């Protein structure tokens, strides 16, 4: 399965980069993640509980980061095992493109699944992967970015109150 897309995040590239390397941010953003530990240098270990079609499983896995070119690009490779449900493994190439105060995050993912998951068929797996990616990037954008100002809305609030919680940490 292959998945490519890009997302505009309302934060500068350095903030987005820091978020991608922070296990607390990742835990908060990965749908169903119950545990996340490790570091960018040593890799991350995670536990994720998900339901894919009729199959519900707890996946335990590891993710390693390589080819890190701060704050422009990195490669993630990982594998997770979900017991009788099967396994998932794959990688992602991530590229950050600064656009003023915003960053466009481009990603190309290639993944393989096996076991009961593979028996569900590519339509269900591909739909699930797209849904997971959409949810992750929505959560990630909320965590590291400032909200986009609505046109016609009075901007009387203090802007520091509008920033995401991670941005408050690094500001």
Q: Each predicted region: which residue ranges?
A:
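Hydrophobic ligand-binding cavity/cleft-lining segments
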Residues: 1-43, 47, 51, 153-171
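Beta-strand/loop substructures that line and gate deep hydrophobic ligand-binding cavities in soluble
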Residues: 80-127
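Hydrophobic pocket/interface hotspot
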Residues: 16-20, 26, 65, 107, ...
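Glycine-rich portal/gate segments that line the openings of hydrophobic small-molecule binding cavities
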Residues: 37-79, 135
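Intrinsic-disorder/low-complexity, polar/charged segments enriched in Ser/Thr/Lys/Arg/Asp/Glu/Gln
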Residues: 2-6, 43, 58-60, 73, ...
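A conserved amphipathic terminal alpha-helix motif
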Residues: 116-157
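Hydrophobic/aromatic beta-strand elements that line small-molecule binding cavities or substrate pockets
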Residues: 5, 34, 61-67, 78, ...
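Alpha-helical membrane-targeting segments
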Residues: 52-56, 114-124, 128, 157-158, ...
